[in-house]
Amino acid sequence: MSQNTGKITQVIGAVVDVEFEPGKLPEIYHALRVTNPAINDSENNLVLEVAQHLGENSVRTIAMDSTDGLKRGQAVLDTGKQICAPVGKKTLGRIINVIGEPVDEMGPIGNDKENPIHREAPPFEDQSTKVEAFTTGIKVVDLLAPYARGGKIGLFGGAGVGKTVLIMELINNIARQHGGFSVFAGVGERTREGNDLWMEMKETGVLEKTALVYGQMNEPPGARARVALTALSIAEHFRDDEGLDVLLFIDNIFRFTQAGSEVSALLGRIPSAVGYQPTLATEMGELQERITSTKNGSITSVQAIYVPADDLTDPAPATAFAHLDATTVLSRQIAELGIYPAVDPLDSTSRILDPQVIGEEHYAIARQVQYILQKYKDLQDIIAILGMDELSEEDKLIVARARKIQRFLSQPFFVAEVFTGSPGKYVELKDTIKGFQEIVSGKHDHLPEQAFYMVGSIEEAVEKAAKLAAV
């Protein structure tokens, strides 16, 4: 069979128009290949994905790499299939890019199976509805917004409040304890962070159970808009073909939307609210619906979601909210108090914070903690204007306990040891529940609040209080 070739008629940034012979138009999402000498010396090194049929035998495509160096009239080859990602155990311990090529200079992947990156979500009858919580070892998460196995979790936060550190701690804790395979998608984030993560994983021994897929900030929007789908294809293979429970980490899902917005404008679509693409909800839905649990295996996904200007009503984070089972909201106000992880205990939610799933005791203590923190928040205006002395004795007690709870929700992280000098702590769920139950019941009312800051279990807080008293 002769190969189907076309020629470039127009190049505008990351968008390339290609003309084919009559009756030979490639299908939407098909990958085309062209040689771009500006990238490297190899043949057909640039992949273009068909996005639109323009009429007059032309297609509009999105480039997955730099288009500098392309010329009008250049020959373009239709591969006759979608962009495919290498799947299977050979991808573990490797870093690949959006088109499935290794970028870690460790030679070819040598896999024998590939999956297309665009696929349908599993049908309803194949999906699993079983609900169970899994422990992360992070107190604030396990107590107030527990994560569901096979669920979707969003970490929301503005710039610099600790989303990537939290996601790295979750990889460290869950991947170590979970023992299964993980897939990490670096979507439009800093290359330095990607490098840090790779080094960290290598040192902790998690790397051989993780596949890394990177499309960083410096890549064209086409690559950033598709890299999450490449990672998802790898995770789907482990779930569907090998029947495993997989962890999928995406940092950052906002960059997926941002890249879609750039591409949408280049494709000539009229922008929607706040300049986002009109297809925002559809694109997010197509990605999120594929991240699900089936009767065969599960994908538990943790997604960092950047919140532009700390505005949770922005269309990008607001669209992601609808798909999530648990949300962990990071707050700048809490970060300013020096409390890390800077999780907002009143804004974070979980579908499984339900006595039927987590048990009566856990539920009751979580609600008591939220009540005390909410009461403290309500009293803050009075304290700011009139001072603590004007409060009733009961309110003074609530404020004292709330401040202890607030500090006890902080925790030293394993991945932050190099910055803080404090050894990381993994806290079992039973210890978390016991600790907060003791604070709420007033057992530790006599201890100073700084004893509860940056410790693991309640025993460590008591020990720290004894050391403080001895000074």
Curated annotation (Swiss-Prot):
Enzyme class at the top of the EC tree: translocase
GO molecular function, one term: proton-transporting ATP synthase activity, rotational mechanism
Gene3D superfamilies referenced in this protein's UniProt entry, alphabetically: 2.40.10.170, Bovine Mitochondrial F1-atpase, Atp Synthase Beta Chain, Chain D, domain 3, P-loop containing nucleotide triphosphate hydrolases
A GO cellular component entry from the record: proton-transporting ATP synthase complex
EC number annotated for this UniProt entry: 7.1.2.2
The organism's place on the tree of life at top rank: Bacteria
Location of this chain's protein in the cell: Cell inner membrane
Bilayer disposition of the protein: Peripheral membrane protein
Catalytic activity entry: ATP + H2O + 4 H(+)(in) = ADP + phosphate + 5 H(+)(out)
Residues where ATP binds: 157-164
Keywords: ATP synthesis, ATP-binding, Cell inner membrane, Cell membrane, CF(1), Hydrogen ion transport, Ion transport, Membrane, Nucleotide-binding, Translocase, Transport
Pfam families: ATP-synt_ab, ATP-synt_ab_N, ATP-synt_VA_C
NCBIfam families, per the entry: atpD
Record family assignment: Belongs to the ATPase alpha/beta chains family.
HAMAP family: ATP_synth_beta_bact
Job description of the protein: Produces ATP from ADP in the presence of a proton gradient across the membrane. The catalytic sites are hosted primarily by the beta subunits.
Known partners and oligomeric status: F-type ATPases have 2 components, CF(1) - the catalytic core - and CF(0) - the membrane proton channel. CF(1) has five subunits: alpha(3), beta(3), gamma(1), delta(1), epsilon(1). CF(0) has three main subunits: a(1), b(2) and c(9-12). The alpha and beta chains form an alternating ring which encloses part of the gamma chain. CF(1) is attached to CF(0) by a central stalk formed by the gamma and epsilon chains, while a peripheral stalk is formed by the delta and b chains.
UniProt name for this protein: ATP synthase subunit beta 1
Species of the source: Pelobacter propionicus (strain DSM 2379 / NBRC 103807 / OttBd1)
